[in-house]
Amino acid sequence: MPGDCLFCRIAAKELPAKFVFENERIVAFADLHPQAPAHVQLIPRKHIASTLEVGEEDRAIVGELVQTAAGLARELGFADDGFRLVFNTNGAAGQSVYHLHLHLLGGRTFRWPPG
């Protein structure tokens, strides 16, 4: 774990976060600056900087992130209305924390194309 990685520190519970799910491989917590009424970050406990660094050995964890996000959308009550899942990769796409994270956004109507 890189010592300066914000999300590694959250996953290790060195920094506070409102956890909505956790297991031995991933954690999910409420976004500190939500962009929708429901905005959850899902991250692997293993440090992976971005989608560009997802290796063959990481394929299962990416699938688990997506499956867990769908389950949380159901639990939080907005799955039937619809929700958005987003991986941002690198600066021009809006990635500000270089630890793989999946945004789960729901509770409002989204437009296309996104911002």
Spell out what each predicted region is.
Residues 1-115:
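HIT superfamily nucleotide-processing domains
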